[in-house]
């Protein structure tokens, strides 16, 4: 059994027990989150929503919050003696899928 959910403008294929790294959102650690934006669900037969499947929910449990590896952005303009180096670390929220309700 799997479902395709939408979270923060991105789509994820999930099944029970999966460990996901989502974009950061405010939630306590060990909190339970219900995602009702289920685009498709497969439970012996595929149900596709228009745009969402009615009555379907995915229950997620927040494990922790953290930061990814640093991404470095480097711009150089040749022969202009101009360069720019910036970096950032994207924040994420790690969750585990507890239940899929069709």
UniProtKB/Swiss-Prot annotation:
Signal peptide per UniProt: none
SUPFAM superfamilies in UniProt: L21p-like
Name of one Pfam family that matches: Ribosomal_L21p
Entry keyword annotation includes Chloroplast: no
Intrachain disulfide bonds: none
GO biological process, one term: translation
Assigned protein family: Belongs to the bacterial ribosomal protein bL21 family.
Free-text function comment from the UniProt entry: This protein binds to 23S rRNA in the presence of protein L20.
Quaternary assembly: Part of the 50S ribosomal subunit. Contacts protein L20.
Name of the molecule in the record: Large ribosomal subunit protein bL21
Organism: Campylobacter jejuni subsp. doylei (strain ATCC BAA-1458 / RM4099 / 269.97)
Gene of this entry: rplU
